[in-house]
Amino acid sequence: MGRVSSLALALLLPAVQAQQTLWGQCGGIGWTGPTNCVAGAACSTQNPYYAQCLPGTATTSTTLTTTTRVTTTTTSTTSKSSSTGSTTTTKSTGTTTTSGSSTTITSAPSGNPFSGYQLYANPYYSSEVHTLAMPSLASSLLPAASAAAKVPSFTWLDTAAKVPTMGTYLADIKAKNAAGANPPIAAQFVVYDLPDRDCAALASNGEYSIANGGVANYKKYIDAIRAQLLNYPDVHTILVIEPDSLANLVTNLNVAKCANAQSAYLECVNYALIQLNLPNVAMYIDAGHAGWLGWPANIGPAAQLFAGVYKDAGAPAALRGLATNVANYNAFSISTCPSYTSGDANCDENRYINAIAPLLKDQGWDAHFIVDTGRNGVQPTKQNAWGDWCNVIGTGFGVRPTTNTGNSLVDAFVWVKPGGESDGTSDSSSARYDAHCGYSDALQPAPEAGTWFQAYFEQLLKNANPAF
């Protein structure tokens, strides 16, 4: 859908019109506020719902959409949950079809898929840090910001239009490996485009609707990802599969949208696991986090669901295990359980993993795990409640990606959530506003999910543990 450019709007509107501050919203569906930016900033469209005043002129702001990102549709990288007592109500943070069994694998790759590889630093995230964050940072923070931009993080494929970006990155990795990268580089992507996505919340609604051919569209999306992976069979690729999706089926079937999506979610995830079961791939299904599925009432049903999904897909050899704490804040290991975890003995990710792993093994799946440590550097957190997921105040970057986890069940600590991208808007008039983003423990004002949140990035940088 065509949109009038910010420059054209500036020519059409009176010069006396109110101007939006740097990093403020300046456009989007339903927006009635200022559409001009203060001097030194330009209004840049991030997605149909949100345009933001970014540093620079209208010309330089186009660096936001370089060849490393195919579309400006919102990147929603949020995994959410809210807990009460011993139970949890979750609220999530050219297609080529290729088929055939000749490229699937029938025996599992041996060992930890992270061992012997270095991880790819997400070029789009690096561009966000250098073009959006650093121009307005204090000089004392610039070295730390530059270092953060180099930390490998996952690229989120949250719309079908972004799948070709895989080809750009995989080609770059292939070239670097051919040039002698030592150890060789591995790619990291998040598969995140289910129909009726984010079924228990509003902040990260996706592009597909079950009622409007969403399942068929999702399968085309997976086929396109498979085609990219087949084009680069010599690039080792690690995938996180559908944050929040299966966890919502454990705790949120009382929500009509989730109940209606249950069969579609299972069908789509099953299709993804089968089609992406390739020799150069290692997959981890998202498994929420300790404050979501670690509760006594939830952990058994969660293990049953995950093991069932594993078996229903034919025990894919490329399916290594589960990803936890995606886009969340939990400690991996904490000596004293925080007060907001009261009632859940599994008060950190280490305890959660150690509790669910034997339940999975009892049902035939010897699963391993990865843990997102991108925003868990401050412990305990400043959450008023464990389920407060949106742009939580006081957080910091956590441990950098490593295979040195101290737990043989845990393959690696990783950065799945790109730190500095918003979890959701605090603007209550927005179509995608979720009340969690207006809570007192959420940093405000906040832009739409997936768009750059300068104040949050600075918070993560200042509170990084270990420091940069």
From Swiss-Prot:
InterPro entries: Beta_cellobiohydrolase (IPR016288), Beta_cellobiohydrolase_sf (IPR036434), CBD_sf (IPR035971), Cellulose-bd_dom_fun (IPR000254), Glyco_hydro_6_CS (IPR001524). It holds the Pfam family CBM_1. It catalyses: Hydrolysis of (1->4)-beta-D-glucosidic linkages in cellulose and cellotetraose, releasing cellobiose from the non-reducing ends of the chains. It comes from Aspergillus terreus (strain NIH 2624 / FGSC A1156). It is an enzyme of class 3 (hydrolase). GO terms for molecular function: cellulose 1,4-beta-cellobiosidase activity; cellulose binding. The keyword Signal applies. Disulfide bonds join C26-C43, C37-C53, C199-C258, C390-C437. The lineage of its organism: Eukaryota, Fungi, Dikarya, Ascomycota, Pezizomycotina. Its EC number is 3.2.1.91. Has a modular structure: a carbohydrate-binding module (CBM) at the N-terminus, a linker rich in threonines, and a C-terminal exocellobiohydrolase catalytic module. The genes for catalytic modules and CBMs seem to have evolved separately and have been linked by gene fusion. Its main location: secreted. This is Probable 1,4-beta-D-glucan cellobiohydrolase C. The gene is cbhC. Residues 107-468 are annotated as: Catalytic. It is found in: Secreted. The biological conversion of cellulose to glucose generally requires three types of hydrolytic enzymes: (1) Endoglucanases which cut internal beta-1,4-glucosidic bonds; (2) Exocellobiohydrolases that cut the disaccharide cellobiose from the non-reducing end of the cellulose polymer chain; (3) Beta-1,4-glucosidases which hydrolyze the cellobiose and other short cello-oligosaccharides to glucose. Residues 57-106 are annotated as: Thr-rich linker. Keywords: Carbohydrate metabolism, Cellulose degradation, Disulfide bond, Glycosidase, Hydrolase, Polysaccharide degradation, Secreted, Signal. The active site is at D198, D244, D423. Residues 68-107 are annotated as: Disordered. GO terms for biological process: cellulose catabolic process. Belongs to the glycosyl hydrolase 6 (cellulase B) family. It comes from the Eukaryota. One of its GO terms (cellular component) is extracellular region. Gene3D superfamilies: 1, 4-beta cellobiohydrolase. Residues 1-18 form the signal peptide. Residues 19-54 form the CBM1 domain.
